[in-house]
Design a protein with these regions (language model features):
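Secretory targeting and sorting signals
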Residues: 1-31
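Catalytic loop of the DD-peptidase/beta-lactamase superfamily, centered on the K-T-G motif
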Residues: 2-5, 27-74, 266-402
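Hydrophobic (often cysteine-bearing) scaffold residues that line and stabilize catalytic clefts
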Residues: 41, 45, 94, 98, ...
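Residue-level preference for non-acidic, small/hydrophobic
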Residues: 49, 68, 99-102, 106, ...
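N-terminal carbohydrate-binding/catalytic regions of secreted carbohydrate-active enzymes
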Residues: 53, 64-85, 92-93, 100
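Short active-site loop at a secondary-structure junction
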Residues: 58, 82-143, 193-202, 279
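Short, surface-exposed loop or secondary-structure junction motifs
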Residues: 133-343
Length: 402
């Protein structure tokens, strides 16, 4: 997302202390890509998770995978009322991490000859992108994926924000939305800049990307994700919710501040949400293990031909307003950690959930993290995973990609 700041501190009284659980699975393998021993990384990640809970987040889960060695960590609670601890295999809304799946599908469709990334939006969706200075004849599929289309971010619309980012959301979260309905919110505004002028994060473009997936294949967007990614990789814990409002089990509660006030201490259970409100810009539900499996396969060259993977990793400088990464390609961003390790991945923010998955360039080491709240995030988790326990301290960041 663009405008909503997701960094917020403030204690939640019902979380008196962290509930920390760690687990190791699979045999040890040779390590690569970091100057920190495994034990330091695991201890550092767990400490960063515990610190985030102490700072007021209900609960955190993470999985760090290096080769065939898997470490799972949890901290805090899944339910503020019962005190039930979080568990490592919980499903959560991965939000904008969905964008990496969407870009992968479109690139795979290109490899199959179904479309070209240089096709215009007008070619696939005639008459959809027009009015208020918007022109689908001048925007390519590639520009949707790398956020250089210039299309207005629909989540920045004042009416939309009132409906979905305030207490009104307690009712509106049950509404079913069509992709076209969502796109029209963005198209009611003039574009922010001419197509191709710069990178600027826009969910509007990814809704259109999902619509193009359907036009090019004759199948639903969900069908294409399952066909090209989930089934080949055996991702049995990953689902596309459609217009369902419920979460598959096991899952934690999702807590939202529903306010831009950084001093608020009032939080709401928003676990139930109509999945249609996100679509291809952020609807997927998954687990840390499944998302790690996806990024490992993607960056390891198992999902896309070399030409398409190279295109995905061709980066543009981040012009904002979303913080947290320095470059963005096609549904994939990158940045360097404090110790110089370059990581590739994506973050996601939904009401009641913040998540990130990052990996080394070859996908050998992958980290997936989820917090069941939307008001604070810690860069220390990633820093510790790739640089060691003393790399960073838990604290605030800017807006996370929504």
């Amino acid at each position: 997302m663009t405008v909503r700041t997701m960094a917020r501190t403030g204690a939640i009284g019902l979380v008196a202390a962290a509930v920390a659980v760690t687990a190791f699975t699979a045999p040890a393998q040779a390590d690569s890509g970091s100057g920190a021993p495994k034990s330091q990384r695991h201890q550092g990640v767990q400490q960063a998770m515990d610190d985030l809970v102490k700072a007021g987040i209900p609960g955190v889960i993470a999985q760090l995978r290096t080769g065939d060695r898997v470490w799972n960590g949890t901290s805090g609670v899944a339910d503020l009322q019962t005190g039930k601890p979080r568990r490592a295999d919980e499903r959560y809304r991965i939000a904008s991490i969905t964008k990496t799946f969407v870009a992968t599908v479109l690139l795979d469709q290109e490899a199959d000859g179904l479309l070209s990334l240089d096709d215009t939006v007008e070619h696939w969706l005639p008459g959809v992108v027009q009015g208020n200075g918007n022109d689908g004849r001048k925007i390519t599929v590639r520009q949707l994926l790398d956020h250089t289309s210039g299309l207005f971010e629909y989540m920045g619309d004042p009416g939309y924000r009132k409906k979905f980012f305030t207490k009104e959301y307690l009712q509106s979260r049950y509404e079913t939305w069509t992709p076209l309905q969502t796109v029209k919110v963005g198209l009611a505004h003039q574009p922010d800049f001419a197509p191709g002028a710069r990178h600027q994060y826009s969910n509007t473009g990814y809704v259109l990307a999902g619509m193009i997936i359907e036009k090019a294949s004759g199948n639903s967007y969900a069908h294409e994700v399952r066909k090209r990614i989930l089934k080949p990789l055996g991702m049995r814990n990953t689902t596309l919710p459609g217009n369902s409002v419920t979460m598959p089990n096991p899952h934690s509660k999702a807590y939202s501040a529903l306010s831009d006030d950084p001093n608020t201490t009032e939080y709401f259970d928003v676990t139930e949400q109509n999945g249609s409100q996100a679509f291809a810009d952020g609807d997927i539900i998954s687990t840390t293990g499944d998302v790690n499996r996806f990024f490992r396969a993607l960056l390891g060259g198992r999902l896309l031909p070399a030409e398409q993977l190279k295109a995905m990793k061709t980066m543009h400088p981040n012009a904002g307003p979303v913080a947290g990464y320095t470059e963005y390609g096609l549904g994939l961003y990158s940045y360097r950690t404090s110790c110089g390790v370059k990581v590739w991945g994506h973050s996601g923010g939904a009401s009641g959930a913040l998540s990130e998955t990052v990996a080394t360039e070859d996908g050998r080491r992958t980290l997936s993290v989820n917090v069941n709240a939307d008001w604070n995030w810690s860069p220390a988790i990633v820093e510790s995973a790739f640089c060691g326990a003393k790399a960073a301290k838990a604290g605030k960041t800017g807006p996370i990609a929504r």
